[in-house]
Amino acid sequence: MSLRVMSPAMLNAWSQTLVRAMSTQGGAKNIGFVGLGNMGANMASNLIKAGHKLHVFDISKPACDGLAAKGATVYAKTSELAKNSDFVITMLPNNAIVDASYDEMTADGVNKDTIFIDSSTISPDLVKSLQKKISAKGARFIDAPVSGGVPGAEQATLTFMVGGTEAEYNAVKAVLECMGKKITHCGVYGMGQAAKLCNNMMLAISMIGVSEAMNLAVRQGLDANVFAEIINSSTGRCWASEIYNPVPGVCPSAPANRDYAGGFSSALITKDLGLASGVANASNSPIPLGSLAHKVYQSLCDKGLGNKDFSVVYDLMKKEKFSV
């Protein structure tokens, strides 16, 4: 079939298949993956689909079993996983866990050719600290956080924001392309995280804005689907409305249709907003809306909603009284 008559969906599927095929032209790589949560499990699965040999670790046995069923090798110790991997990708919840994981993983030494790739969302300062520690041991470390959520992880359409040298970026690009469609070199170590924190701050602000607007429209008598269609064909169009709408029934695949289960938890975006606030304070950058968004999501966590998807903020907006 000629490319010019392919539908957009068919063309995207074809291009993703081509990218994956090209990623293993030099031979399948041994890739370690630590952290098999909502994002990590899907990212790891796409590496297997691309033909790489996957080595995995997670504290959750069911998560490990799910990848083992697809062909991955499960390890009891991350240090052993790292010694058997050309690349090691980490996808973990916070600074403390990432820091401790790398200490454990590299305690017995590292292979000189291994490249460690952290795709968690952590502080730029921790990135720089880890890079120095691992470089001193003879290996390489870069930051490569992601955007695109669980749908992007499932479909291998994530955006990767890479911090490191140009040579390191080129060395990891083919591996990252197995999991994403946009791989951007943001600059030196920590710049990937700087981009990610700014993006997530904007995401939180936009989700609150969409939730406020949707709630106001519904209370005026507008149908939620009608108003969402208007937003998505007007100047208010954004990812939080078009792909991840917080109102149940508007976007079939959004967490709003599963009682806000799964997805990107309110606890995690609260953590990210805290990191963004720290970076803003250190650089003397005003973030009035970012600070307010942090308070809103901290309020959600205080109300016991930290495990719910961050779009649950709409559910709180529906209540007659809402306060931060």
Swiss-Prot record:
Catalytic activity, EC: 1.1.1.31
GO annotation, cellular component aspect: mitochondrion
Cell compartments where the protein resides: Mitochondrion
Active-site residues, Swiss-Prot/TrEMBL: K196
Targeting presequence: 1-25
NAD keyword on record: yes
Pathway: Amino-acid degradation; L-valine degradation
Transmembrane regions listed in the UniProt entry: none
Keyword Transit peptide: yes
Keywords tagged on the record: Branched-chain amino acid catabolism, Mitochondrion, NAD, Oxidoreductase, Transit peptide
SUPFAM superfamilies to which the protein is assigned, alphabetical: 6-phosphogluconate dehydrogenase C-terminal domain-like, NAD(P)-binding Rossmann-fold domains
UniProt cross-references to NCBIfam families, sorted A to Z: HIBADH (TIGR01692)
Family in the record: Belongs to the HIBADH-related family. 3-hydroxyisobutyrate dehydrogenase subfamily.
Protein name as it appears in the record: 3-hydroxyisobutyrate dehydrogenase, mitochondrial
Organism: Drosophila melanogaster
